[in-house]
Amino acid sequence: MFQSLIAIDYGKARIGIASGQMITKTATPIGTVETYDGVPNWIELDKIIKRWNPSDIIIGLPLDTQNFETDITKSAKDFAKEVQQRYQRKVHLINEAYSTREARWRLEEVKSKKVSHIKVDALAACVILETWMSEN
């Protein structure tokens, strides 16, 4: 059974991270980890995984609006394989279409004074996790 979960919004500049619980079906933004040319700061990601100890990791798969792969899809799939091997957790890929748009909309709704990339990326990870939890 799923315990705690981590969701990742993969990107070439940074990855957004959120945590969640299946029992409550809630997700909370944790923050971001910088990436360098698509390679994450593994030391920072290691710390997050160790701290939250998720049973499963959900990674957003960047597809276009017609569910076709994009330039970044292969990088996200490679990243997901590395995460699975590195942390020995079950990794689930989910279409992340519109997660960033939804995150921006949520921040605007709460009248966030500063819509930063960090907030958007972490909140996009929440959207990814909430979507996955609602489907599972």
Curated annotation (Swiss-Prot):
The keyword GTP-binding does not apply. GO terms for cellular component: cytosol. Its EC number is 3.1.-.-. Belongs to the YqgF nuclease family. It comes from the Bacteria. Its main location: cytoplasm. Pfam families: RuvX. It is found in: Cytoplasm. One of its GO terms (molecular function) is nuclease activity. Could be a nuclease involved in processing of the 5'-end of pre-16S rRNA. Keywords: Cytoplasm, Hydrolase, Nuclease, Ribosome biogenesis. SMART domains: YqgFc (SM00732). CDD domains: YqgF (cd16964). NCBIfam families: RNAse_H_YqgF. One of its GO terms (biological process) is rRNA 5'-end processing. InterPro entries: RNaseH-like_sf, YqgF, YqgF/RNaseH-like_dom, YqgF/RNaseH-like_dom_sf. This is Putative pre-16S rRNA nuclease.
